[in-house]
Amino acid sequence: MPNVQQTILVAPLNWGLGHAARCVPLIKALEHLGAKVILASDGAALNLLRAEFPHLPAFQLPSYRIRYQTDNMVWNIARQMPRITYAIRAEQWATERLVREHGITGIISDNRYGCFSGGTHNVILTHQIHLRVSNAALQWAANQVLRLALRKFDSIWVPDSATDPNFSGELSHPPLKGFDIKYLGLLSRFSGDQPPGLANATAGKNANVAVVLSGPEPQRTYLEQILLEQALALPHKFVFVKGKTGS
């Protein structure tokens, strides 16, 4: 009996370009395995996926529209929770519609907590399985909410190494008990030692350090300014890839 082709929905969060970019090697691997791939996101993340995979169907999902208006991350997220909760519900409705209309058999959701369906195998791609908050009581409560959200998924894929050295530290380690967790290692859309765009940017400049930025504003710009100040104080040569869409 021939194998049935799987139809996989890949849906990264639109929070900078990092989530969409790290889905690129997964999408290529799925295509190599013969799966039919459908893409879904919003904003710059969706634009990146459409540019990378113009031959694949791509659909708009509701936007979380998260904004950082203060330096307090907890307060920033807490005050936007009603809108985020509504967006997740709308995202879940949109996902169920895509599953019905396109015969989707599996979902890989990169940090989109509404992208799951009762009729599919659901995977969430995230490096954040432990939340870290300065207040112990808030941290416990936040992690209970996170675990409830993660329970909606059959598997958790962590884009990091299972052992030291790793990038995400306490956010991803140790693995959560009672969850199916797989550590994938680091994911990058770049093949080879250096992406062609970065090679062109550094050509003839003898740069020692490449700084690749992404993320939501205004935090991306704040980080850029801090790193620029530090770069000017160091003897090394830097090249900055600013991760600004439309530039």
Segments from the language model and where they lie:
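Conserved nucleotide-sugar phosphate-binding/catalytic loop shared by glycosyltransferases and other
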Residues: 5-7, 13-14, 32-82
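Donor-nucleotide binding loops and adjacent catalytic segments primarily
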Residues: 171, 185-247
